[in-house]
Regions:
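Charged, low-complexity C-terminal accessory regions
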Residues: 40-53, 66, 70-145, 149-151
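Polar, enzyme-active/binding microenvironments
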Residues: 200-210
Length: 211
């Protein structure tokens, strides 16, 4: 949501940003994502196979929260913009900073480190603060830490990293080189899992237009 960034107001780069363009870009990306799922469901239906119905969970982050913050700071915007503008039909939508526990693993855009609400800065600290397996985004690089609880069960804290195909203007040449990809969790059992990173370069090589 670059148009609502309070950090860039007054900068030359802020010129030309529009809320409607931000929403349209996000909704178009979501449409592309959902089309892949619907295409697979249609394929299975034609072959009379069990339909794949994944549980879809969307944890609102600080960029989506800019919408609510803008309305809160300027009452004239009430009714003109809201998170309802985002095309999230079919998703379970979690409010900003509200965790959700699935199979013993806590997920949130980020986890706070204390009463001030600042984000936990690394995976090891996340385990120390929350004492359970946790997965979060927010930061620009991946990080992972492991521990065991008093019962001897494994705990994993994961910073998922980014999923970009491009360089971001707000990052520098070093941070733009961060690992980009997604994660698959296998053998999930009450907070324990085997994590499998899948890089963007691997996905593009296997499923891209030139593969």
């Amino acid at each position: 949501m670059p148009s609502l960034s309070s950090y860039d107001v007054g900068k030359k780069s802020f010129e030309g940003r529009r809320y409607s363009a931000d929403v349209e870009a996000g909704n178009e990306a979501m449409q592309v994502f959902m089309d892949c799922i619907r295409t697979e469901q249609q394929r299975l239906r034609r072959r009379k196979k069990k339909i794949w119905k994944p549980r879809l969970i969307f944890t609102l982050g600080n960029h989506e929260h800019r919408i609510e913050r803008a309305v809160e700071n300027d009452a004239k915007l009430e009714g003109l913009m809201s998170s309802e503008d985002l095309n999230l039909r079919g998703w379970e939508v979690l409010p900003y900073l509200q965790p959700i526990i699935v199979d013993g693993i806590a997920y949130c855009h980020f986890f706070t480190s204390g009463v001030m609400g600042r984000a936990v800065t690394n995976a090891k600290l996340l385990l120390q603060k929350k004492h359970m397996s946790c997965v979060m985004g927010h930061v620009q690089d991946r990080d992972i830490a492991f521990d065991r609880n008093a019962a001897g069960n494994r705990m994993t804290a994961l910073f998922a990293g980014i999923f970009y195909q491009h360089d971001e203007e707000y990052l520098n040449p070093q941070t733009n080189g961060s690992w980009s990809g997604l994660w698959v969790f296998n053998e999930v059992d009450n907070g324990t899992f085997d994590e499998m990173p899948v890089s963007m370069s691997y996905l593009r090589g296997k499923y891209g237009a030139n593969s």
